[in-house]
């Protein structure tokens, strides 16, 4: 069981015969009246997002989510193929389930496949990825004082904002949780 007062981002639990993941939460303690927990929840089966308020003492059964390392192989139309790194078994997953989570993942990278009772509902990419910049405007010496950014296309085709000193061919580290530039690796 999980208590609503212990909610954190990413916690999964069962409620009304559905499985929800906490996307945002806020503990509210008004000057008058009882405290409550305001949440934004994602139904991991349907993908719908709902807002719900809980009493901090409300208890829900925790959903047991399986996370399995699999290698992203390739995509063919609306199907993405992954391979179990232990059994070499291939698993096709449709684009609706994946969403935009593979924007920063290259073929042959290892990702975590999320499932509940055998039903795949999502993918968790590595927290940080290192990708090569394939196209961006050239940077000029002395252009870094303002902290300005420019668009850059990385090798997966995703466009990200980078500092002006980043050039085509540079390897950059990106945080996949926020899809933001972290640093230049080389």
From Swiss-Prot:
Q: Which UniProt keywords apply?
A: Cytoplasm, Elongation factor, Protein biosynthesis
GO cellular component terms, semicolon-separated: cytoplasm
- One Pfam family in the UniProt entry: EFP
* Primary site of residence: cytoplasm
Membrane-crossing ranges are none
| Pathway noted in the entry | Protein biosynthesis; polypeptide chain elongation
Which Gene3D superfamilies would you find in this protein's record? Answer: 2.30.30.30, Nucleic acid-binding proteins (2.40.50.140)
* GO BP: peptide biosynthetic process
Q: Which InterPro entries match?
A: Elong-fact-P_C, NA-bd_OB-fold, Rib_uL2_dom2, Transl_elong_fac_P/YeiP, Transl_elong_KOW-like, Transl_elong_P/YeiP_cen, Transl_elong_P/YeiP_CS, Transl_elongation_fac_P
Q: Which GO terms describe its molecular function?
A: translation elongation factor activity
- Subcellular locations according to the entry: Cytoplasm
HAMAP family in the record: EF_P
What biological function has been recorded for the protein in this entry? Involved in peptide bond synthesis. Stimulates efficient translation and peptide-bond synthesis on native or reconstituted 70S ribosomes in vitro. Probably functions indirectly by altering the affinity of the ribosome for aminoacyl-tRNA, thus increasing their reactivity as acceptors for peptidyl transferase.
Sorted alphabetically, which PANTHER family does this protein's record hold? Answer: ELONGATION FACTOR P (PTHR30053), ELONGATION FACTOR P (EF-P) FAMILY PROTEIN (PTHR30053:SF12)
Q: Which family does it belong to?
A: Belongs to the elongation factor P family.
Q: What is this protein called?
A: Elongation factor P
Gene name linked to the record: efp
